[in-house]
């Protein structure tokens, strides 16, 4: 019989990351930089999203050796990505002892119809979402943490802003609905009714909701916090910048003090060049990672 963690325990682990920054790293050296800069966790992977996007082909779970090297290098929680629907990659990461698994659209999906039943696992999961319907379905499957999908590896914040604003607007809409309207709304957005009822009563998702996908500067991180994010994932924005150590520290500080504009101005001075960005409209439909895991049965 497979051991499974309770929602309360899994969600509690995610709550502990609230207000912080989670950084993508590809080796132990980068993990140490992230930890020293104040990251609350790191995401261990073979290539940051910008490199995955540039390389093309099939992107898979990282080599377990990389994951273990990162785990041995830092004392903060370590996350790792598996492909959408790939049961065995998820089980391997769980066996390695990672603190969190990201069932991620950044990697090439293994299943175009089904996401993982995350309730079958002891390890908690984070999943991406573009709107309340997607978030609710992932939570219904057992996700303990949600993040905006944004458009990974672009250094362009516009899609993360779109997704966060969409979710916040839909949460406000549900909160103001009468109970007898909820079933129709659940049908319309493909969300579990009981979850919408919980959102109506509390005015928020039952799990933390981080921003991800396109965060490249301290100002980007502060913007997402102001829009209602509980924290920030930074993928390519740190180690594709000119000065990773400076960007890492500045983004952590800006995430914490997201309404202190004098401080954010100071943090933004002399950082060097941010990662090269990509205009979203130049991407073909096949290059848009945010649409993965959605078109067929998300």
Swiss-Prot record:
Residues at which D-glyceraldehyde 3-phosphate binds: 165
Gene Ontology terms, MF aspect: pyridoxal 5'-phosphate synthase (glutamine hydrolysing) activity
Active site: 81
Gene Ontology annotations of biological process type: amino acid metabolic process; pyridoxal phosphate biosynthetic process; pyridoxine biosynthetic process
Keywords carried by this UniProt record: Lyase, Pyridoxal phosphate, Schiff base
EC number: 4.3.3.6
Lineage top rank: taxon: Bacteria
Database matches in InterPro entries: Aldolase_TIM (IPR013785), PdxS/SNZ (IPR001852), PdxS/SNZ_N (IPR033755), RibuloseP-bd_barrel (IPR011060)
Chain residues that bind D-ribose 5-phosphate: 24, 153, 214, 235-236
CDD domains listed in its UniProt record: pdxS
Name of a matching Pfam family: SOR_SNZ
Pathway(s) served: Cofactor biosynthesis; pyridoxal 5'-phosphate biosynthesis
Magnesium among keywords: no
PROSITE patterns in UniProt: PDXS_SNZ_1, PDXS_SNZ_2
Catalytic activity: aldehydo-D-ribose 5-phosphate + D-glyceraldehyde 3-phosphate + L-glutamine = pyridoxal 5'-phosphate + L-glutamate + phosphate + 3 H2O + H(+)
HAMAP family: PdxS (MF_01824)
Task performed by this protein: Catalyzes the formation of pyridoxal 5'-phosphate from ribose 5-phosphate (RBP), glyceraldehyde 3-phosphate (G3P) and ammonia. The ammonia is provided by the PdxT subunit. Can also use ribulose 5-phosphate and dihydroxyacetone phosphate as substrates, resulting from enzyme-catalyzed isomerization of RBP and G3P, respectively.
Matching NCBIfam families: PRK04180.1, pyridoxal 5'-phosphate synthase lyase subunit PdxS
Annotated family: Belongs to the PdxS/SNZ family.
Quaternary structure note: In the presence of PdxT, forms a dodecamer of heterodimers.
Protein's UniProt name: Pyridoxal 5'-phosphate synthase subunit PdxS
Gene responsible for this protein: pdxS
